[in-house]
Amino acid sequence: MPLYEKVRFTTKLQRGNRFQVSKYVRWKYKLETNQTLKVTLIVIGVWNTLQVFLARMSQDGRIVIPKTNMTLMQNREVELAGYVLNVTLEPF
């Protein structure tokens, strides 16, 4: 059963412009890997920029942030890996 409501959670940005959707969130909201999701990201502690893009989750629960969105989010001196993200997932 695909996602029908907004899901908000906090996670850490990993290396390779990815973040992990926890098993609990995937189980509770019955997230499927074949569903296209509208992802909204806010990086805590850098800029208060809001980035929105469409994505699919991989089998292991990771979502890759597009390179265009990453360049808009990050400052040239700051590497964002390890920063905390506020994530909102909603059906597309």
Where are the language model's segments positioned?
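Hydrophobic beta-strand residues in large extracellular and virion-surface proteins
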Residues: 19-21, 37-41, 55-57, 63-65, ...
